[in-house]
Curated annotation (Swiss-Prot):
Keyword Transcription: yes
SMART domains: TFIIE
Protein name as it appears in the record: Transcription factor E
Subunit structure: Monomer. Interaction with RNA polymerase subunits RpoF and RpoE is necessary for Tfe stimulatory transcription activity. Able to interact with Tbp and RNA polymerase in the absence of DNA promoter. Interacts both with the preinitiation and elongation complexes.
Native source species: Hyperthermus butylicus (strain DSM 5456 / JCM 9403 / PLM1-5)
Length: 173
């Protein structure tokens, strides 16, 4: 299995959950529409779990369905497939949202100085540290200036650049 497909499965799992990933994998491997019962059989998941995963993925635009009346049972059967047409825009919008969150985090990281507890690693803004007289309210240790600030800023910048490159250089605003 290619790394791109594995990334897509991981994306589905993070966006929804592990059951949705199994359902998505079953749809991908089938390469065609599947009924809910067929998906349950292929994944080993209960039918209600399959339906919940499918509905969650449908809300996010990852899968689509069509209804068809069953000829003998006189009930509706839902046939599901991956929404290949919509996936690129869904992934791009998630990347844009992540880009915006990272930009906000970077701005905060660059503008605020943090103090950290050397014992438990809890971070406090200068104002919070001042309120506690530079003593950790949890353990009583002396708070020290966060020395990893520059490293965190550098990492955030790298992730932001990576997302901007993937988004075609267009900066999300």
């Amino acid at each position: 299995m290619s790394s791109e497909i594995e990334k897509l499965f991981t994306f589905v799992e993070k966006l929804v959950d592990s059951d949705a990933r199994k359902v998505f994998e079953a749809l991908y491997e089938a390469g065609e529409e599947l009924s809910e019962a067929d998906i349950a059989t292929k994944t080993g998941l209960k039918l209600n779990v399959v339906r919940r995963a499918l509905n969650s993925m449908a809300e996010k635009g990852l899968v689509v369905y069509r209804r068809q009346k069953h000829p003998q049972k006189n009930k509706l059967v839902f046939y599901w497939r991956i929404n290949y047409e919509g996936l690129p825009s869904i992934i791009e919008s998630r990347k844009r949202a992540a880009h915006e969150k990272l930009r906000t985090l970077l701005e905060k990281e660059e503008s605020v100085h943090y103090y950290v507890c050397p014992r438990d690693g809890t971070r406090y803004t200068f104002e919070e540290a001042l309120d506690h007289e530079f003593i950790c309210p949890r353990c009583g240790s002396m708070l020290v200036l966060d020395e990893e600030r520059e490293l965190r800023i550098q990492i955030l910048k790298q992730y932001i650049k990576m997302l901007e490159d993937e988004l075609g250089g267009a900066k999300a605003s």
